[in-house]
Amino acid sequence: MSEVANSTSPVQDGADANGAQINTNVPAASGDAPTPTTAAQQAHQNSASLYVGELDPSVTEAMLFELFSSIGQVASIRVCRDAVTRRSLGYAYVNYNSSEDGEKALEELNYTVIKGKPCRIMWSQRDPALRKTGQGNVFIKNLDHAIDNKALHDTFAAFGNILSCKVAQDELGNSKGYGFVHYETAEAANNAIKHVNGMLLNEKKVFVGHHIPKKERMSKFEEMKANFTNIYVKNIDLDVTDEDFRELFEKHGDITSASIARDDQGKSRGFGFVNYIRHEAAAVAVDHLNDIEFKGQKLYVGRAQKKHEREEELRKQYEAARLEKQSKYQGVNLYIKNLNDDVDDEKLRDMFTPFGTITSAKVILRDEEKKDEEEKEVKEEKKEDEKKEDEEAKEGSSSEQNGEDTKAGDKVTIKGEKKILGKSKGFGFVCFSNPDEATKAVTEMNQKMIEGKPLYVALAQRKDVRKNQLEATIQARNQLRMQQQQQQQFGGIPQMFIAPGQQPMMYPPGARGQMPFPAGMPGAQGGRGAGFPGGMPGQQGGRGGPNAQQMPPMYMPPGMAPGAFPPGPYMNQQYMQLAQAAQQAMGGRGGRGGPMPGMPGMPQAQIAGGPGIRGGQGGFPQGGRGAPGGRGQPPMPGFPQGGRPGGPGVDMSVLSAAAPGQQKQMLGEALYPKIHEMQPELAGKITGMLLEMDNSELINLTADESALRAKVDEAMSVYDEYVKNKEGDGEKEAPKEESKEEKA
């Protein structure tokens, strides 16, 4: 909220809430200037913060400013929004510079219709303890649906100052028949309950009482459930009379009432209620009479429940059944799409039978047309057929065509009669008996060509899970797009693919077409003519060190931060080769030869065995791709080019269970080694470009070498065009610089 809103003091009581404030500023005895605390208190007295609720989600700050500025000078307005989606939460805060303006806005603008919804205005209460006390809060039920917030406020305003008034509404804005009135004092609430409870409002008798928090209501409700006296009986024979019904339950205790529900004609509806005096008698009746046969019917006898309690119990049962079903089919139900139109349930079952026992196989069909529409079309078509037959009879043509079958989409006409057949939607589901069979089917059948079309096979997911994943994917793409826009400000290089454990790459300003270097590698000591910032740990920059824009990137093994040294086999072979290559790359004309000093975690004997640093201009060419004659370092022998030991593969079961961000990382690890074989110099850039595609297409690229090569060639053409454009811009800028030098 704004500074004015933050400086607004909490409303302590009703007098302050309505702007009637007491001047507590006592003049200082000395002539000293007022302290900052005194000035802040004076500022608080001249400001007012209002809470504006029940707002439409489309209401903006500008709309509220236009409304509230008509009262007085507005200091600030803020519509509260969700931190992630930025959608309005339906309420806002309006801050005035004076409490008089706030009081005037509360009186004149309360319940003003904004975007078709009446707003609700009250003083902002910052202390949550005071907001949640509930003192003076009144609950009203059995309200007529014509009573709105304004009418309820006008009705109860006669008994005291109202802080807030609200009628509960559904999604469509219709009254739910109950509401709340929050008074400034408990005395006003008691006065309203005394005079209005049991009175008629719009010809309906209303109940008015103190609002009881839900927690207290639930505790009382549980106590009532434990000491019930009213029981519900169903499956009663229609011939049972009230006397027979009463005699059956009087055997177990004294009852106050026993009745069978009947319709308007007096016929039994098959259920009734019995109310006992004591809870013990009701409990005995439930235990002894439940599931017994009475007049040929097995009775159900149980505690009587209210409607909301039954609905809650049914909801819990449904949720439990849903969770049980979800756990039952977890990992065994497969989703298959890209099916041909002629594939039915039997063909789908035959496709997946070799992988295990199938409990169900279903191809989803399009919904059949409504019967009334079908009947109309059939009648119209019959009329058209009759006209055609009459014309053909007149022309003397044969009627052999009437018996032929003509197919048009999902409509089949046979001898003038039309039948609506469901057409395949192109996807279906197959459920196996155990997860191992399902995993095997996904591995073998995904991307397999069936009748010229590659199948997509994956574990089935619920709609809400897919929706959440889609939202996460969209959010990740938006973040990626923002990162790319930021990178374009520093040279516009496409995003690099970062292997596991590496830090993001940083592009120096003006380094067009060059490979980036890892940012923030600790330990580099800057010297005269120092090498790239963030160099190898402990390495000192020499006079002849290469500039930062020519330094090749340092690829670190997976799971290892830059500047650290790997354990195990990397220490002896692969990492030594990486260290030696870095030594050679950092050599300058004036650099010293010899081993690298002070590398932590490595014996000096191993370091000394490497070649000394020789002078030279190592680096990558600045024009785009690394030329064959360049001094860039080739891939290290013995170290996997994919950035991890062995060739990475894609496990479909693991991939489908991973988060969207992890799925992209796994697919990138699988594609990077293959792209590196085709284009070693630009493998990272190309992988980053391809990862913007959908996961289904990326999975296809991991299995189809020709498709991957085509995508790589396409990416290379885009990159070459980008480099040419950058070089053209540089050539255009060069003559201007030369002309400036000539003038100088």
From Swiss-Prot:
Gene Ontology molecular function: any one: poly(U) RNA binding
GO annotation terms (biological process): mRNA processing; mRNA transport; regulation of translation
Chief subcellular location: cytoplasm
Basic and acidic residues composition-biased segments: 376-397
GO cellular component, one term: ribonucleoprotein complex
A Pfam family the protein falls into: RRM_1
Compositional bias segments (type: Gly residues): 527-545, 609-632, 640-649
Domain of life: Eukaryota
PABC domain residues: 647-724
Composition skew (Polar residues), residue ranges: 1-11
Subcellular location: Cytoplasm; Nucleus
Sorted UniProt keywords: Cytoplasm, mRNA processing, mRNA transport, Nucleus, Repeat, RNA-binding, Translation regulation, Transport
Residue segments, region Disordered: 1-42, 368-411, 527-550, 607-651, 723-744
Family: Belongs to the polyadenylate-binding protein type-1 family.
Role summary: Binds the poly(A) tail of mRNA. Appears to be an important mediator of the multiple roles of the poly(A) tail in mRNA biogenesis, stability and translation. In the nucleus, involved in both mRNA cleavage and polyadenylation. Is also required for efficient mRNA export to the cytoplasm. Acts in concert with a poly(A)-specific nuclease (PAN) to affect poly(A) tail shortening, which may occur concomitantly with either nucleocytoplasmic mRNA transport or translational initiation.
Protein name: Polyadenylate-binding protein, cytoplasmic and nuclear
